[in-house]
Amino acid sequence: MRYYLIAGEASGDLHASHLMKSLQTEDPQAEFRFFGGDMMAAQGGTLVKHYRELAYMGFFPVLLHLRTILKNMKMCKQDIVQWQPDVVILVDYPGFNLDIAKFLKAQTQIPVYYYISPKIWAWKEYRIKNIRRDVSELFSILPFEVDFFEGKHHYPIHYVGNPTASEVAEFRKNYSESRADFCRKNGLASGKPIVALLAGSRRQEIKDNLPVMLQVANEMSDYQFVLAGAPGIDDDYYKKFMAASSITRLVKGQTYELLSHAHAALVTSGTATLETALFRVPQVVCYETFFPRVVGYLRKKVLSVKYISLVNLVADKEVVTELVADSFTFTNILYELSRILEGPDREQMLVGYEEVARALGNKCAPDEAAHLMVKLLHSSI
């Protein structure tokens, strides 16, 4: 069968690539065409547009690039119609993907599957109407979404397990590199504890968050701070910021290896918070925004949830500290990081991580999703 996938950022590229691999196992004749990235391209098929040309986040970046975004949407719709896939699989990225789903429902007979559903439980809950109307099947990766979609909105979904949990478990099972070897390979001091910096996957996130993280690094000489480079972001972009902190090192393509040896982490909100928890690395969640006081106020008034990090959302309580908008300050980050380097607060966070891991379960998400997708497609023929 023919599968058209759309992923608009680095995390979507990762999860979609694993789904593609599982789909090939379930359907050896699978053909792929996609908006995505290098990891999806490695699975075969045709890369139509790289996510680097799609990944705009926040009101002002989206407004500035609106013409490009609309042009990409039009191109995507035309390409799908011309290729005529058996199914279109949307991977997160709701601003773009829900528009594609609306078009496909209105103009074609192509079924739409959503893998990694829009987080409408956080905000824009009204989008449930669009999802109910335009999405044929929804495959959830967060256990609490079952209650939200099925319990609150009476919209049946499939919880397939969490792909991040599957990926981390697989990596930890097979990874054997010693700390000394990792440090030697990356020019790090083997005897100095590592604090990992995960500053986001988009340029705007990095620009907003990394400078303050580096200020904190300059104040903690007993630790070595190591920045995990995101896929699709070139070294020169990071080095513009790192010039202010000569003690910080950059590693690329080794985020899981870095987390395997990290003592603690500063993490920009997103999938990375969950990855860090599953590696049992105590963390502070940091997220800077435009107009922080305004955003801090609106967050309390607009968001439908108490937390922004997946760790706290899955646990349904505060396991990790979230420094967002008006609470994102150098002083707060330094204090909260110091608090989890040793002692009871650190141990309490690690206990919370175990609760999160149990809630996610041990299903292999891409395998489970691929099996269901192929089964559903065959039953509809």
Name these PLM-found stretches.
Residues 1-381:
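Nucleotide-activated sugar donor-binding and catalytic core shared by glycosyltransferases
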